[in-house]
């Protein structure tokens, strides 16, 4: 069984990691905004340093070219990042290219 925690709360992530039952983390911009982080990239990198498993981070762009560019940047932040891409025609097109590049992608609505 895999257990993914849907949060951006660092303390919750630390506690879950300490218990050893969390497989990974899913985040989104609204969850991160609640945590009032000063720097989005640094904040995500901190989460990635706590959890060994996948950390899903959402790309906000809507057209394929912009999604690809944003996803490449996000994926460069840490080796355990999975980029969340919208399940739209543009997102699927971007996913095809990103997969060929070895970037881990999670399609979501």
Regions found by a protein language model. Give the residues of each.
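Active-site beta->alpha loop and helix N-cap motifs at the rims of alpha/beta catalytic domains
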Residues: 3-5, 9-14, 19-22, 27-106
